């Protein structure tokens, strides 16, 4: 099935947002949340972020299956990510905002990418791969 230009632009936009989301999350985790001498805090942040960002995705997928409103959830996720990363907040509030924001973004972004791609796995691969590039870029920016 052929995908039209408008849909291609939307998938590219979602993929670019994925790069930004994962880059911002990686940078924030390293730059703001791991800054400590305590190994205990590092473990709590690592487990907390990954639990919120990844293990909560089935729950948010279920919620969105029930109520829809993906555009609202996408907007909320981006706001959570900006607030959690751009403002000086307590460590665990920032952790919560970027973790949950990341989870919601991945559910909505993945659904839209699959839907908009109309069976063309190239575009789903684009969405996924730019997220991985974002992780690498966020880590690189932190280290430089």
Where are these regions (language model features)?
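Helix-loop boundary and gating motifs at the non-cytosolic
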Residues: 2-50
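Helical-face signature of the major facilitator-like transporter fold
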Residues: 14-18, 22, 50, 91-103, ...
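Central cavity-lining transmembrane alpha-helices of secondary-active solute carriers
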Residues: 43-64
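Small-residue-mediated transmembrane helix hinge/kink sites in multi-pass secondary transporters
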Residues: 58-65, 111, 139-143
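Cytoplasmic membrane-interface "Motif A"-like loop-to-helix N-cap segments
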Residues: 65-78
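C-terminal ends and interior cores of transmembrane alpha-helices
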Residues: 76-92
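Intracellular juxtamembrane helix-capping segments at the cytosolic ends
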Residues: 103-118
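Glycine-rich segments within core transmembrane alpha-helices of 12-TM secondary carriers
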Residues: 119-143
